[in-house]
Amino acid sequence: MDELKKTKELVEKYLKKKYPDAQFTDEDLEFLARFSVKKEPKEREILKELGLISGKGTVQGYYANHKSVKNAKDCIQAIYERFNTKRNSQKEKEHPVDVFGDDFEAFFAWWCEKTPEGGIRKCCYCEVDEDTVRAAFAKDEKDKCVISSKKRSFSGELQIERKNPNGDYSADNCEFACVICNNAKSDMISAEDFKKFFVPGIKEYWAHIEEEIKKKNP
């Protein structure tokens, strides 16, 4: 199968999960595959080549009339930033491990595979969904939140967990995990023992947090 066609199909598969009600043309999908996933430069030139803008048309004008494409582009860019941050952090370590073969498309394919229909991911251990985690860390008008931490890495985003902490970041070794599970599980505890002895208490904790969120946002 043609490489670009495979990338377009991957983009389409992810967008159907993330934005099930949005409509994308074949040209939209090719643009996102080339610019957002394959990281081809010259955004305007790609749009012109695909007939998405013409004459004095601008990139900004295209996005103004195609908000679903703008949202999709921004979403894929956020995923790329997660990949790039992980890759760069490993490069700074004395003993770095491989991050998806230094290939964003491989990382994006894994992300897509781990994203369920509807686009809401869950922790692989305690099964809390990311909407709950985000709500717990969200600040209100008084700059208060249900869960707070001084560590920037402790946030409402699900983290990338290596099942084997000594292994690479790869499709068969990575899952999404909430910040609580990801930081509670160490290389001393197997996934099976963690689920058996620790996860029940963490589930109770998240149930408590959900009640606190409801009180905060009645």
PLM-predicted stretches and their roles:
Residues 168-218:
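A detector for short metal-coordination/catalytic motifs
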Residues 6, 15-17, 34-42, 48-98:
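Secondary-structure boundary/linker elements at domain or insertion junctions
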Residues 105-108, 124-176, 185:
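Histidine-centered nuclease catalytic patch
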